[in-house]
């Protein structure tokens, strides 16, 4: 659950935003999977793919933090969705509470909007088929939102606090849950639960090789019931290179799907192109 930004200063490598970004609004982005018929050949060919772009480590080797891409004329924006479920919410799911939002995913597909979903491992355990479907759709990419959705700092919106010696293992456990669900290519991107991090948590994850992904636009969709207000807050905040944080949990963000029906056409009308976080990181000087 994300309510506001809480972070320390972190160094992010940024570069010129330009032709590295592919056309958006369709699965024809550079990291989409394209499969066609292979013409007959007399020699064997081997398909290779580049690893996802990541930022270089921060000062003293700390986990790098990405917030937004350079402000250029490219007018790109990445919509991100946190698939929240904490480790102790299984009983609530069993009682009928919905932590997924298939209609939101369907709306993104209908409008052909690429997006990055930051998923908890517990969510993938609860909804393995949906996790796999999202991971297999070339419109989307899956980032890590921890397994437990416990806080990586003290005093983070009432979330239970995780000890430093468990942090890296919790992130690795989430990736294991994704693989168990059938997600083959989860990205090396991590979003801290609650958006809360400090030197200690950045140090704890430094060996994991992830890039921490924050945001510069808060949608305010958590527990919101006014879709128009959510849409307006996003539209007021988006600039070129923005990362928008939203949620795809029906119980905790019931207005988000409806808000998207306003946000998507309006941003396109303003000349924005939707991209995934990986594309913004690549444009910001991310290394492969």
Task: Annotate each predicted stretch with a short phrase.
Residues 2-99, 131, 262-263, 269-288:
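N-terminal pre-catalytic segment of deacetylase/amide-hydrolase enzymes
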Residues 47, 51-144, 148-159, 173-186:
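Active-site beta->alpha N-cap acidic-glycine motif
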Residues 77-80, 115-119, 141-144, 188-192, ...:
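Structural recognition of the beta-strand scaffold that forms the well-ordered cores
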Residues 87, 94-96, 119-128, 191-198, ...:
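Acidic-and-aromatic substrate-binding clefts and catalytic sites of carbohydrate-active enzymes
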Residues 101, 105, 131-132, 168-175, ...:
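Generic structural signal for well-ordered alpha-helices
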Residues 135-141, 169, 225-227, 234-247, ...:
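Accessory recognition modules or surfaces
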Residues 197, 201-237, 272-283:
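His/Asp/Glu-enriched short active-site or ligand-binding loop at hydrolase and phosphoryl-transfer sites
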Residues 239-278:
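Catalytic grooves of carbohydrate-active enzymes
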């Amino acid at each position: 659950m994300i309510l506001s930004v809480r972070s320390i200063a972190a160094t992010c490598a940024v570069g010129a935003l330009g032709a590295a970004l592919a056309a958006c609004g369709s699965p024809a982005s550079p990291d989409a999977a394209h499969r066609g018929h292979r013409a007959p050949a007399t020699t064997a060919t081997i398909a290779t793919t580049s690893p996802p772009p990541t930022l270089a480590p921060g000062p003293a080797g700390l986990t790098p933090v990405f917030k937004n891409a350079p402000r250029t004329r490219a007018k790109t924006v990445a919509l991100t969705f946190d698939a929240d479920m904490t480790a102790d919410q299984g009983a609530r799911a069993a009682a009928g509470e919905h932590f997924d939002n298939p209609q939101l995913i369907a709306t993104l597909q209908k409008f052909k909007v690429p997006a990055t979903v930051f998923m908890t491992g517990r969510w993938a355990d609860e909804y393995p088929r949906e996790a796999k479907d999202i991971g297999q759709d070339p419109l989307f990419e899956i980032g890590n939102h921890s397994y437990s959705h416990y806080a990586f700092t003290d005093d983070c919106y009432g979330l239970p606090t995780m000890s430093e010696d468990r942090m890296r293992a919790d992130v690795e456990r989430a990736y294991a849950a994704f693989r168990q669900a059938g997600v083959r290519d989860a990205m090396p991107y991590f979003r801290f639960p609650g958006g809360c991090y400090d030197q200690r948590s950045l140090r704890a994850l430094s060996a994991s090789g992830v890039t921490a992904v924050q945001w510069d636009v808060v949608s305010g969709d958590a527990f919101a019931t006014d879709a128009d207000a959510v849409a307006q807050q996003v539209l007021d905040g988006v600039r070129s290179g923005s990362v928008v944080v939203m949620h795809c949990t029906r119980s905790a963000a019931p207005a988000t799907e409806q808000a998207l029906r306003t946000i998507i056409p309006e941003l396109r009308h303003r000349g924005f192109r939707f991209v995934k976080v990986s594309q913004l990181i690549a444009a910001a000087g991310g290394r492969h």
